[in-house]
C-alpha cells in the first residue's frame, strides 16, 4: 500500500514538473527573425555611416520584444548568426552597430564568432 502511494506521488510530481517546464525550443522562429531583419540586408552590406532608417529599427525592436526569455534570445541569436552567414558581403561592423543606432540593447554583439549558448 505504501509503495503504491509513493508511486502515485512520484507520478504526480513528474507531471507537475512536465507541465511547469519551459519549452525546449524558443518561441522565436527563423522565419520571424528573417522577416524582421530582411529590410536591413542592403544596409548591412555597405559602409553606412548614416543613421539606420526607421523601418530597420522597427524590425529590431519587434525582435527584442519577442525575445523575453533566455531561450528566445538564444534562438534569435542562432537565427541572426545563420542569416548573417547567408548574406554575401556583410559588413559585420555595420551589422553589430545597427541595434545601437536603433537604441536597442541586445546582450551580444552580432558577429560570426558569437557563441549563442552563452547569451543570457
UniProtKB/Swiss-Prot annotation:
Disulfide bonds, paired cysteine numbers: 57-102, 77-116
Protein name per Swiss-Prot or TrEMBL: Non-specific lipid-transfer protein 6
Transmembrane intervals: none
One Pfam assignment: Tryp_alpha_amyl
Classification via PANTHER family: NON-SPECIFIC LIPID-TRANSFER PROTEIN 2-RELATED
Tissue specificity statement from the Swiss-Prot or TrEMBL entry: Specifically expressed in fiber cells.
Family from the record: Belongs to the plant LTP family.
GO BP annotations, alphabetical order: lipid transport
Function: Plant non-specific lipid-transfer proteins transfer phospholipids as well as galactolipids across membranes. May play a role in wax or cutin deposition in the cell walls of expanding epidermal cells and certain secretory tissues.
Stored Gene3D superfamilies: Plant lipid-transfer and hydrophobic proteins
UniProt KW Transferase keyword: no
Provenance organism: Gossypium hirsutum (Upland cotton)
Lineage, highest ranks first: Eukaryota, Viridiplantae, Streptophyta, Embryophyta, Tracheophyta
Amino acid at each position: 500500500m505504501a509503495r503504491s502511494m509513493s508511486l502515485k506521488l512520484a507520478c504526480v510530481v513528474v507531471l507537475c514538473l512536465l507541465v511547469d517546464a519551459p519549452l525546449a525550443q524558443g518561441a522565436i522562429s527563423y522565419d520571424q527573425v528573417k522577416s524582421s531583419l530582411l529590410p536591413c540586408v542592403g544596409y548591412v552590406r555597405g559602409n553606412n555611416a548614416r543613421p539606420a532608417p526607421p523601418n530597420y529599427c522597427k524590425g529590431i525592436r519587434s525582435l527584442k520584444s519577442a525575445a523575453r526569455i533566455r531561450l528566445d534570445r538564444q534562438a534569435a541569436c542562432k537565427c541572426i548568426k545563420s542569416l548573417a552567414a547567408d548574406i554575401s558581403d556583410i559588413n559585420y561592423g555595420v551589422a553589430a552597430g545597427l541595434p545601437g543606432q536603433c537604441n536597442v540593447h541586445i546582450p551580444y554583439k552580432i558577429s560570426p564568432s558569437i557563441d549563442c549558448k552563452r547569451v543570457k
